[in-house]
Amino acid sequence: LLAGSDAEQEHKERLRKYSGAKKHSVAVAEYIVDHEPLLFKEAEVVRLCSNWLIFRYFYTAGKYRMIGGCTCKKHLLCAMCALRRSAKTVMAYSAKIGHVMTENPGVIPVLLTLTVKNGPDLEERMQHLESAISRMIRNRSNARSGCRHQTVFRLVHGAAGAFEFKRGSGSGLWHPHIHLYALVDAETDLMAMEWDMSEEWRKLTRDSHNVDVCPL
């Protein structure tokens, strides 16, 4: 393997991400022990996750692949397991989306981001976001099934996505949002779509008009 090759650089970047995730998992384990000492065993499992990993270089494919390691499989607590789980999910959905786009050459992918107003209560904000999305999906289904209900979300043929939660370092408020990998017709005016979605999203949430439609 030549130094500076694409495979080597890709592997180094992967290890850098794993290192950051490992540090985060250790921090979570320490937090658990500090606040719930009785959960020491559970915290220790998270702390020891990915203490060793085995990689092999497959020269015929020109890639490094992880072939072994110790993992806790607690993706809700462990950043390392969450990272690997999300990577597998992306691979699975990428294949499905690729198949759909092959059979429907007239569609293009866009990244659709929907958010709600920040707040101090994560559970309340999450329920608020889920409720707005449920109404959005119901309106879209009605519009696409022939009902008179009009919604700009009817322009989305299909989507797959995930929730993300951030907390303001200064305000301490929770910022929940959802990222959707969506498929729309190639001739869709994305700027007009974003504007109309923003107005409709404001009516659904009653506290936010933050919508972003980005071509991929």
What are these regions (language model features)?
Residues 77-83:
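Short, cysteine/histidine-rich loop/knuckle motifs that typically chelate Zn2+
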